[in-house]
Regions:
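Ligand-binding pockets and gating/stacking loops
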Residues: 2-501
Length: 501
């Protein structure tokens, strides 16, 4: 039965008003005509999911089995990734980025450079604190600070014109590891495991091995899952601190333990039947099951007792500082995790806080000669041994090694005359292994190492290249969150094809 106007609400009567109807209809017709004209001229906004033909690829993740292996977007050699992260900002001009002009202008005021930087007034230009020498067959100039890594430069692919968006450590760590300066976004390792899963189910797909001194400045955000399913966050432990509650209580027999686990499985399965499609519940059940498998697999992988004495010597487990010994054991643990098929291993060399006698990372606003030397003694030999071990075993053919820090340091000293300030305008990272050129350098900073000058590379470009080496299109690997197709590279970045082997 038709509704009579007198029975309508005031709002309904307005909708039926003849004059209003004709006006609205006319505007709608005009809007349709305008849309057609704009579309003809290719000026109409497109569906963001299909701009440039880039339709998102959201992995089909089974919440009950989130770690099942998934196919890459295209074939590439990198099946696993080792990220060696050095918090605090390693000085590129004292390690891998040789600048002869610093020797020539040592002690002079820097030309055309701000009088004040991140932590105060600018001092004078300073030559490198360590001598640079040509290394390997390529003759790459590397300083004496890192002799172990210097011997391997023929296997490395350097990025010398990296830039970042911030000069603060927490935001810099976030940006390097998650693609955003703010917290709450998924880390690189989370994106990689969300896309690919893992070949082995008895260990986490993504493990973060923290420095013996603790977490880095941005804490667990460096390996967090953000808005991705919780299954893809990094599981953090190191050679001295295994995950909690791995050992069976002494008053619980193996039979009783297995019975408890089986009962829990049945109860969880029954509970899930009541709530089909509940991804959070299925994810929690999957995490419980992984924890059960880890009770056997983690103690086995952490048991370094079977490592030959020669290997322990190569890594520098003994004969150096206590911290070097602990970091060396972490490096061996990283190798063992990769051998067991863990997809992404993130190894930290540095923590928070820093300063004074409590130096815990590469931050060097004062006494850089001492602080960098201390960190190098911890990092260099074990890291070089780890990379050499991967090469010797053949694992480097399918493992991508990433050595990274959040930004560089200034070519001039701070006013105190003994340290270098933060430099977001230029810094160096390197890759090795699967899919990258060997003995190659990409990009250049200016003559002082102050700004990126040739082939400037953003962090988004760097991360896009890492994903590409794993067979993943950074523009199509997305997760729908808060109305947006989120990406590791936000809406930026391009693959640096010049570094691909």
């Amino acid at each position: 039965m038709p509704m009579k106007p007198e029975n309508l609400t005031q709002q309904g009567r307005r909708l039926l008003d003849r004059r209003g109807f004709l006006k609205t209809a006319g505007l709608s017709t005009a809007a349709l005509a305008l849309a057609q004209l704009l579309d003809n001229d290719d000026l109409l906004a497109k569906d963001p999911r299909t701009v440039g033909g880039k339709v998102p690829i959201r992995p089909g993740v089974d919440p009950a089995n989130p770690y099942l292996p998934r196919k890459a977007h295209f074939p590439m050699p990198a099946r696993q990734v080792l990220v060696i992260y050095c918090p605090g900002a390693v000085s590129h001009v004292d390690t891998f980025d040789y600048k002869p002009a610093l020797n020539k202008l040592h002690g002079k005021k820097p030309p055309s450079i701000p009088a004040v930087t991140f932590e105060g007034p600018t001092g004078n230009i300073s030559r490198p604190f360590w001598k640079f020498r040509p290394r390997g067959q390529t003759g790459k100039m590397v300083s004496d600070l890192l002799p172990g890594l210097a011997d391997q430069v023929d296997d490395f692919c350097f990025f010398h014109a990296l830039t970042t968006e911030t000069s603060a450590h927490p935001q810099g760590e976030n940006f390097m590891n998650t693609g955003f300066t703010m917290e709450g976004f998924p880390s690189f390792g989370s994106w990689a495991t969300y896309a690919l899963g893992t070949e082995r189910q008895e260990l986490p797909a993504f493990v973060a091995i923290n420095d013996p001194r603790g977490l880095a400045r941005s804490g667990k955000n460096n390996f967090g899952n953000g808005f991705l399913p919780a299954a893809f966050q990094g599981t953090d432990f190191n050679s001295s601190n295994p995950p909690n509650n791995l050992q069976r209580p002494k008053n619980l027999s193996p039979e009783a333990d297995r019975g408890t686990v089986e009962l829990l499985k049945r109860l969880n399965a029954r509970h899930l039947e009541k709530y089909p499609g509940d991804a959070d519940l299925a994810g929690r059940i999957a995490s419980y099951e992984l924890a059960g498998r880890m009770q056997t697999s983690v103690p086995e992988v952490m048991d370094l007792a079977g490592e030959p004495e020669k290997v322990l010597e190569e890594y520098g487990v003994s004969g150096g500082s206590k911290l070097r010994g602990e970091y060396a054991r972490n490096c061996i643990l990283a190798r063992r995790l990769l051998e067991k098929g863990v997809r992404v291993v993130q190894l930290f060399n540095g923590s928070d806080p820093s300063g004074g006698n409590g130096i815990t990372n590469w931050d060097s606003h004062s006494n850089i000669a001492d602080t960098h030397a201390m960190q190098a003694e911890i990092m260099d030999q074990p890291t070089a041994a780890l990379i050499a071990d991967l090469k010797r075993s053949g694992m480097l053919e399918h493992t991508l090694v990433v050595w990274a820090t959040e930004f560089g340091r200034m070519p001039f000293l701070q006013a105190n005359g003994t340290g270098r300030d933060h430099n977001p305008g230029a810094f160096t990272c390197f890759l090795a292994g699967a899919g990258v050129k060997k003995g190659f350098s990409y990009g250049e900073s200016d003559e002082f190492g102050f700004k990126a000058a040739v082939d400037k590379t953003t962090v988004h470009d760097f991360n896009a290249t890492l994903l590409h080496l794993m067979g993943l299109d950074h523009e199509r690997l997305t997760f729908y969150h808060n109305g947006l197709e989120r990406r590791l590279t936000n809406v930026h970045g391009h693959v640096v094809t010049d570094v691909l082997a």
